Design a protein with these regions (language model features):
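Conserved AdoMet
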Residues: 2-122, 264
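Conserved class I S-adenosyl-L-methionine
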Residues: 118-131, 157
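Extended basic-aromatic, gly/pro-enriched interface segments that bind polyanionic ligands
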Residues: 126, 147-231, 235-246, 268-270, ...
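Conserved SAM-binding loop of SAM-dependent methyltransferases across substrates and taxa
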Residues: 130-149
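A short glycine-rich, Lys/Arg-flanked "PGG" loop and its adjoining helix->strand segment in the class I
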Residues: 245-257
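Conserved beta-strand signature within the Rossmann-like core of class I S-adenosyl-L-methionine
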Residues: 257-265
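Class I S-adenosyl-L-methionine
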Residues: 267-288
Length: 288
C-alpha cells in the first residue's frame, strides 16, 4: 500500500526507478513497439536495463529516457527493444501449425496458384525472432515441392524488431538441442555440423529467407502484394487489445483472399473479430 506517495523500485545493482520514470519508459515502449509493460514487469525492466545504463554512465532512469529521446538515429531504441523483448524459441515449436501448413494450407495454396497460372508463393513470418520458424517453413516447402521448388518464386520474408535476433537468424547456426525437435530426415538433409555442439542451416535454405528489421507498429505496411500466409506467433501476447485489433486489421489488408493467419496457441483474435474466419485454435483464414 503506497498511501498515495510516489513509489520507487530498486534493482539488485542499486538503481531505482520512480513511478514517473517507469511510466515514461512504459509509454515510450508501448508507443514505439506496441509492447505492453504492466506494473508486474517493473522489476524486470529495472533488472534488464541496469548493465546498459552503467555502461552509458547514466545514474537515473530520467537520464536514460532523455538519452533515448535525444538519439535521432534510434539505435538506442533498438538496444532497448532487444532488452525488453523475449527471443525464446526453437525449431518446430507448436508442431500442429507446421503439420497443418504442410498437409493442408500449403497444398491448398499451391493448387489455387496453379489454377490461376501463378508461381508467386508469398509467406511472411512477422516477429520471426532468431529464425527457427522461417527456416522450418522453408524446409517443408522444399520437401513438398521437391525439384519443382526452383520453378517457383517462393522464399520467405522474415521480420523482427530486434537487431540481435535478426543477426542470429541470418547466421543460421544453433545449439544442437534447439534443432532436435525437428524430424531426423530434415536435420540430416538441411543442416551441417557447426562447432562442437551446434548445427547450421545449409546455404540452400538460408538464401531463401529474407530477413528484415520491421516494426509491426508501422501505421502502413509497405508491401506491394498481399501474402497467402502470415505467421505472427507468440508476438501479440505482449500487446494490449487495442494494439492487437489494429495489427490484425493491417494483417487482414495484407492477406490474399483465401489466405491464412497463424498466431500463437496462447493467443486468440477474440470472438468479436469478423475479419478472418476461424479454422482451428490459433489459425484463421480470410474469406475468398
Amino acid at each position: 500500500m503506497n498511501n498515495g506517495k510516489p513509489q520507487t523500485l530498486a534493482g539488485s545493482g542499486g538503481l531505482t526507478i520512480s513511478d514517473r520514470e517507469f511510466t515514461q519508459l512504459r509509454d515510450l515502449i508501448h508507443r514505439r513497439f506496441g509492447i505492453n509493460l504492466t506494473d508486474q514487469k517493473r522489476s524486470l525492466l529495472v533488472g534488464r536495463l541496469q548493465k546498459l545504463m552503467r555502461n552509458l554512465n547514466l545514474s537515473t532512469f530520467s537520464d536514460y529516457y532523455e538519452y533515448l529521446t535525444a538519439d535521432k538515429t534510434e539505435a538506442s531504441l533498438g538496444e532497448l527493444v532487444d532488452l525488453v523483448s523475449t527471443n525464446h524459441t526453437y525449431f518446430n515449436r507448436e508442431k500442429d501449425h507446421f503439420d497443418y501448413f504442410y498437409q493442408t494450407a500449403l497444398p491448398a495454396v499451391i493448387t489455387r496458384l496453379k489454377q490461376e497460372r501463378r508461381k508467386d508463393l508469398r509467406i511472411w513470418c512477422a516477429g520471426c525472432s532468431t529464425g527457427e520458424e522461417p527456416y522450418t517453413l522453408l524446409m517443408l516447402m522444399m520437401e513438398y515441392l521437391g525439384k519443382d521448388y526452383v520453378n517457383w518464386d517462393a522464399g520467405i520474408l522474415a521480420t523482427d524488431i530486434s537487431d540481435r535476433a535478426l543477426s542470429i537468424a541470418r547466421r543460421g547456426a544453433y545449439p544442437t538441442d534447439r534443432v532436435m525437435q525437428l524430424p531426423e530426415h530434415l536435420r540430416r538433409k538441411y543442416f551441417a555440423a557447426a562447432g562442437a555442439d551446434g548445427m547450421a542451416v545449409i546455404d540452400q535454405v538460408k538464401r531463401e529467407a529474407t530477413f528484415r528489421r520491421f516494426n509491426l507498429m508501422n501505421a502502413v505496411f509497405p508491401f506491394k502484394k498481399p501474402f497467402q500466409m502470415i505467421f505472427c506467433r507468440n508476438v501479440m501476447i505482449y500487446f494490449d487489445q487495442p494494439t492487437r485489433d489494429a495489427l490484425v486489421q493491417r494483417f487482414h489488408q495484407s492477406t490474399e483472399a483465401g489466405g491464412y493467419l497463424f498466431i500463437g496457441h496462447s493467443e486468440t483474435l477474440g470472438r468479436s473479430q469478423t475479419l478472418y474466419r476461424y479454422v482451428k485454435p490459433a489459425l484463421y483464414q480470410k474469406g475468398a
